Design a protein with these regions (language model features):
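Hydrophobic aliphatic residues
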Residues: 20-23, 70, 74, 88-93, ...
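Conserved post-Walker A coupling segment in P-loop NTPases
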Residues: 42-108, 118-134, 162, 199-204, ...
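Conserved RecA-like P-loop NTPase ATPase core
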Residues: 19, 39, 61, 84, ...
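Alpha-helical transmission elements in cytosolic ATPase-linked domains
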Residues: 2-5, 38, 69, 97, ...
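Flexible nucleotide-interacting loop at or near the entrance of a catalytic core
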Residues: 2-58
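Small-residue (primarily alanine) positions within well-ordered alpha-helices
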Residues: 6, 47, 67, 120, ...
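AAA+/SF3 P-loop NTPase mechanochemical coupling elements
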Residues: 112-122, 126, 133-140, 151-170, ...
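Nucleotide-binding/hydrolysis machinery
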Residues: 1-4, 14, 32-35, 74-79, ...
Length: 273
């Protein structure tokens, strides 16, 4: 039994390493453009510190990739990276999600629950789409930043937390401040290091590398024979207006892989992209 347990554990370790490698590849920042290399330089400088970073950029540009890279290159890399999509959580639940709640704090609170700040202890919390967070939740996040303490919903006990905060938004927070939708003091606390992620339209020279990356990844995931893409097809992809950025580009490559033959041609791109 002991030998079997050891073998099972060994298999699990190998499987975990493979999974981490696979996940790592899925979250790589792909490209060699000047714009992307500038971002990499900033990440290398800021990652070893505990400085807060505000990552801005349009939808699908890869803001979460920047956050992951900062965490992975930080001294907190072995601790959790907890991601919270502030836009996906109803405003009445965001405080419970971030700070947890005590049993009986509200009707459905049947047990005490830790929030994301506690779950990220020793690591990093990534507040994605922070521009969509309610003002009351913003006030509590500000307190967590100032005092390194949180209080669960329905509780009065202060809980010390040790987390690094990274935030991202596709909104212009200065305009949100003018409209009274975002706290100016929180903005200044979060944006110690601002990083603007370039759109795909601003780094079209990365399209051949991105195409190759997604071709390999998607064909492997689907268990399909590897496909190629012609130079003319790449040129056609570089002409397009990528308003949906990397996310849209990946979807187009997936569509081309499914609908086209062994080699993706410029005609295929014109027809399906």
């Amino acid at each position: 039994v002991t030998i079997r347990n050891a073998m099972d554990k060994s298999t699990l370790v190998i499987e975990t390493k493979i999974l981490k490698k696979k996940i790592g590849k899925a979250y790589e920042m792909i490209g060699d453009s000047k714009a992307l290399n500038n971002i990499r330089d900033m990440i290398d400088k800021v990652a070893p510190t505990d400085a807060r970073v505000l990552i801005t950029g349009s939808n699908g540009s890869g803001k979460e990739l920047v956050a992951r890279e900062i965490h992975n290159k930080s001294q907190r890399a072995s601790a959790p990276l907890i991601e919270v999509n502030c836009a996906a959580i109803p405003s009445e639940l965001i405080e419970s999600e971030l700070f947890g709640h005590e049993k009986g704090a509200f009707t459905s609170a049947v047990a005490t629950r830790k929030g994301k700040f506690e779950l990220a202890e020793g690591g990093t919390i990534f507040l994605d789409e922070i521009g969509d967070m309610s003002l009351s939740a913003q006030a509590k996040v500000l307190r967590a930043l100032q005092e390194n303490k949180i209080t669960r919903v329905g509780g009065d006990k202060e809980i010390k937390v040790d987390v690094r905060i990274l935030a991202a938004t596709n909104k212009d927070l200065r305009k949100e401040i003018e409209k009274g939708e975002f706290r100016e003091d929180l903005f200044h606390r979060l944006s110690v290091i601002p990083i603007q992620v370039p759109s795909l339209n601003d780094r079209k020279e990365d399209i051949p590398l991105l195409a190759d990356h997604f071709l390999t990844m998607i064909c492997t995931d689907y268990g399909m024979p590897m496909k190629t893409i012609s130079k003319a097809a790449l040129a056609e992809l570089q002409k397009k207006d990528w308003t949906g950025n990397i996310r849209e580009f990946r979807n187009v490559i997936e569509r081309l892989i499914i609908l086209c033959g062994k080699e993706i041609t410029d005609k295929d791109v014109k027809q399906f992209a």
